[in-house]
Curated annotation (Swiss-Prot):
Protein name, per record: DNA mismatch repair protein MutS
Amino acids binding ATP: G645, P646, N647, M648, A649, G650, K651, S652
Gene responsible for this protein: mutS
Family under the similarity heading: Belongs to the DNA mismatch repair MutS family.
InterPro entries: DNA_mismatch_repair_MutS, DNA_mismatch_repair_MutS-lik_N, DNA_mismatch_repair_MutS/MSH, DNA_mismatch_repair_MutS_C, DNA_mismatch_repair_MutS_clamp, DNA_mismatch_repair_MutS_core, DNA_mismatch_repair_MutS_N, DNA_mismatch_repair_MutS_sf
Length: 890
């Protein structure tokens, strides 16, 4: 509502003309930031007023108070302490609010000196915090990126451009994305905030981004993405004369990059960190995994959006934050280039063959810091001395890590390992700069002082000497004046009116002969003096704290500027350390969980021997149970496995584990199997399970058909398709027909690898005329009416689904199971196609939902009733009533 008002309407609403000067200042700033919650610094608190206060008090759970009236309207107010700001910001950002931080740009004393005692302290917004522009350690997940993305769709709409930046690490990337893959790419990146043109607000794309992916969209006017404007922004930011300095980029990529930089400038108030030139990547350089498949396979999050039970949580034994983020990126973007995959696998194999080195390196890596994010805070003037110390300790540890390699291999390291550890040699100049300037006990807050080593700068040493030894200097001056005057009782005292003064008794006045003693005050029994020396000392003592903090800030800024000059090296070092962490992690889990190096081919092989599902296996291990491994042998000649068998037997686990093995292999890790030979997979599609999507108005069947349609449209010969129960959301005949035709299409048109699980046993006859389709089933062991699921995949087809057995395991009443067996028997005795007639006959005689009384049921009820009777406590009347009740029951 406020966004639709003009300035005059806003002033009228808030009684601007009769507001105090301070409140007018607040309103001026608020009117310029209507889309934000405004946190207004007042002394030691950030205050919020009017509607902002009401919203914030609810979100933060803090008291809502009032700050007088503005005209007739009471002003709602709430506030948070400045030192606890980050704790409250977390809640506001999680609630999807943009927050404008308005700080005091001068002290109250400076304001008085400028404009008298009525002057209002100058304030302004120093930054705007949005989900995609956070850098505070406490506000962002340390083990995953925090992307801000800008999506630009040109008029031809065939290819969109996407630029994404992680402000906390200074990573910036641009990519062209086919229009059909936009949602999949956004699902891969999971940006915290997406910039989108206002023209797309009512589009299907915007609706899908918000509803299907649950991502936050920040709309901007169309001119925000104008090509000429964006090109100028890029040239100015990178100090270039020609846009070709970025590389070969399209017009829409220019708009995407420029709009991201402009948004950062607006939210960070020009205080943008040093960003490298955007990295231009090719869309098809990594495996395509659509958003539905990512959800089904629980790659980086579980089905509820948490981390526990995800593939990432199972594989993540990294020991650094930056290593965790790199592993997250690896899993989100598996490679599709065989050479690059094998390069990673060779690195993993090296560390797997050197587990003693891995153990030492992992212990050392724990001592390193997240220097990517330290560097960002430094470049944005939001760092502390501890950020510099973190860089120093990391430089020191890096050289020790390199020494571990040298001790083991000398100069005989493989080239691919030498390339990784080359940056670990450190930078002696940078290390010495920090070591010589920053105190080991440097505080978090620059305003606390004590960050610069005293010996680094003589003035710092002098000022700290005054702060620490002020009383000693006063004592020395007192002793000097006693000697000069001969007055042994002379004192130097202090009060708030005249400050430091020399105090003598009235009887000693005649001994004060030197004119340097200046009379200040006379009382009944005492006379007070001062001197130029004492006034100078007092001034130095009073100002020492302020002066040293100011000087330390100046020196600290200079040190930071020298660190920023080393930004490129520090980013390379961070990349090296995170890479070491991830590959040592791969070696660790390969050893810990018995993983094997996969082999890659350029054909359609998918030959997995004794494969296992890593997440399920780990869960079973916690219960001291073993996972039942299975083989999977897909090839040019046997591309499709049609898998039949009962529920709960392990079909879905088998389907998922093979998709997961492909993903793990193509990130460069060993895999949970005895052996694995894989033709590179360019896309993985998984349609496993469904639930009615009531929010989007889609039934289970519609959701299933939409996903299946997308799979058939986007798959290529090199894709891997995982389908479970296609067609189950409709009638049996419709379902069988759809599943049948889908299988034919995959076999004849796509010719890709596919695992297809179904309850439609009618489909198994397709192996007679589709040469690349083979039937497989789940092994079971029967004993009378009981069956045991063996969880083994074997060649052949299931003759029934064992659904009644599963229903019994689920706890359905015995009477329901018995009745179901009766009806099933009649179906099985009737030829295919007459089931409908049986159902009709049954419904005429007896409802399918009517439970015919039987002796077992009656006996059970009587037994239950008799157990509640105590004959000794029944009165004659109660006994008679009980007899009638039992007769009625029978």
């Amino acid at each position: 509502m406020l966004l639709n008002m003009n300035l005059q309407e806003l002033k009228q609403k808030y009684n601007y003309d009769v507001a105090t000067k301070m409140m007018q200042q607040y309103l001026d700033i608020k009117f310029a930031h209507l889309d934000c919650l405004l946190l207004f610094r007042m002394g030691d608190f950030y205050e919020m007023f009017y509607e902002d206060a009401i919203l914030a008090s609810n979100v933060l759970g803090i008291a809502l108070t009032k700050r007088g009236k503005n005209g007739e309207e009471e002003i709602a107010m709430c506030g948070v302490p400045y030192h606890a700001l980050e704790n409250y910001l977390t809640k506001l950002i999680e609630a999807n609010y943009k927050v404008a931080i308005c700080d005091q740009l001068e002290t109250p004393e400076e304001a008085k000196n400028r404009g008298g005692y009525k002057a209002v302290v100058t304030r302004d917004v120093t930054r705007i915090i949005t989900p995609g522009t956070i850098i505070e350690e406490n506000l962002i997940a340390s083990a995953e990126p925090n992307y801000l993305a800008s999506l630009v769709i040109p008029k031809n709409k065939e290819t969109a451009s996407l630029c994404y930046v992680d402000l906390s690490t200074s990573e910036i990337v641009v990519v062209n994305v086919p229009e059909t893959e936009i949602l999949n790419e956004l699902a891969r990146l999971k940006p915290r905030e997406i910039l989108l043109s206002e023209n797309l607000r009512s589009s299907n794309l915007a609706d899908s981004i918000f509803k299907q992916l649950n991502l936050r969209i920040t709309y901007q006017v169309d001119s925000f993405f104008a090509i000429n404007k964006c090109e100028k922004i890029i040239l100015d930011f990178y100090k270039m004369k020609d846009i070709k300095g970025i590389g070969e980029i399209s017009s829409s990529q220019i708009c995407a990059i420029g709009s991201v930089l402009e948004y950062l400038s607006l939210t960070q108030k020009q205080n943008i960190p040093h960003l490298p030139i955007p990295r231009i990547i090719k869309f098809h350089s990594y495996m395509t995994i659509d958003f539905s498949t990512r959800r089904n396979l629980e790659i980086v999050t579980n089905s509820q959006g948490g981390s526990q039970g995800s593939l990432l949580s199972t594989l993540n034994h990294t020991v650094t934050k930056q290593g965790g983020r790199l592993l997250y990126n690896f899993l989100s973007s598996p490679l599709t280039n065989i050479a690059k995959i094998n390069h990673r696998l060779n690195i993993t194999e090296f560390f797997y063959s050197n587990l003693e080195i891995v153990k030492k390196i992992r212990e050392l890596l724990k001592k390193t810091s997240d220097i990517e994010r330290c560097l960002t805070r430094i470049t944005m003037n939001r760092s502390s001395g501890r950020d510099l110390l973190s860089i120093k300790y990391t430089l020191e540890t890096a050289t020790i890590i390199k020494g571990v390699f040298f001790d083991a291999y000398g100069f005989n390291l493989p080239d691919f390992i030498e390339k990784i550890i080359k940056p670990l040699s450190g930078d002696a100049e940078l290390y010495n700069l920090i070591d010589e300037t920053i105190r080991e006990d440097a505080p978090n807050n620059l305003n606390d002082g004590g960050i610069i080593k005293h010996e680094y700068h003589p003035k710092v040493a002098q000022l700290h000497d005054l702060i620490n030894n002020g009383k000693l200097y006063i004592e020395k001056l007192k002793d000097q004046y006693r000697k000069e005057t001969g007055i042994d009782s002379l004192k130097i005292s202090h009060n708030n009116v005249i400050g430091l003064f020399i105090d003598i008794t009235a009887k000693n006045v005649n001994k004060i002969l030197d004119p340097k003693f200046i009379h200040r005050q006379t009382t009944v029994n005492h006379v007070r003096y001062t001197t130029a020396e004492l006034q100078k000392l007092e001034s130095e003592l009073v100002n020492a704290k302020t002066l040293v903090i100011s000087l330390e800030k100046e020196l600290y800024a200079d040190i930071c500027s020298q660190v920023i000059e080393k930004a490129s090296y520090l980013r390379i070092l961070a990349s090296s350390l995170s890479g070491l962490d991830v590959f040592c992690n791969f070696a660790y889990i390969a050893d810990e969980y018995d993983y094997v190096k996969p082999e890659f081919t350029d054909d359609l092989s998918f030959d997995i021997v004794k494969g296992r599902h890593p997440v399920v296996e780990k869960a079973l291990q916690r219960e001291s149970k073993s996972f039942v491994y299975n083989d999977c042998h897909l090839s040019e000649l046997e591309r499709i496995w049609l898998i039949t068998g009962p529920n709960m037997a392990g079909k879905s686990t088998f389907l998922r584990q093979n998709a997961i093995i492909a993903i793990i292999a193509q990130i460069g890790s060993f895999v949970p199997a005895k052996s694995a030979k894989i033709g590179v997979v360019d896309k993985i599609f998984s349609r496993i399970g469904a639930a009615d999507d009531l929010i989007k108005g889609q039934s289970t069947f519609m959701a299933e058909m939409l996903e299946t349609s997308a799979i058939l449209a986007q798959s290529t010969k090199n894709s891997l398709i995982i389908l479970d129960e296609v067609g189950r959301g409709t009638s049996t005949y419709d379902g069988v027909s759809i599943a049948w035709s889908v299988l034919e299409y995959i076999h004849d048109k796509l010719k890709c690898r596919c695992l297809f699980a179904t309850h439609y046993h009618e489909l198994t006859v397709m192996s007679n005329f589709l040469p690349a389709l083979q039937n497989y089933t789940i092994a079971i062991e029967e004993s009378g009416k009981d069956i045991l699921f063996l969880h083994n995949i074997i060649s052949g087809a299931a003759d029934r689904s064992y659904g009644l057995h599963v229903a019994s395991l689920a706890g359905l009443p015995a009477s329901v199971i018995n009745r179901a067996e009766q009806i099933l028997l009649k179906f099985e005795k009737t030829s295919t196609g007459k089931g409908k007639n049986i159902l009709s006959t049954e419904s005429n005689n007896l409802s399918l939902f009517y439970l015919e009384p039987n002796k077992t049921t009656i006996s059970s009820k009587l037994d239950k009733k008799f157990r509640t009777i105590d004959p000794d406590k029944l009165s004659p009347k109660e006994a008679l009533e009980l007899i009638y009740e039992l007769k009625k029951l029978v």
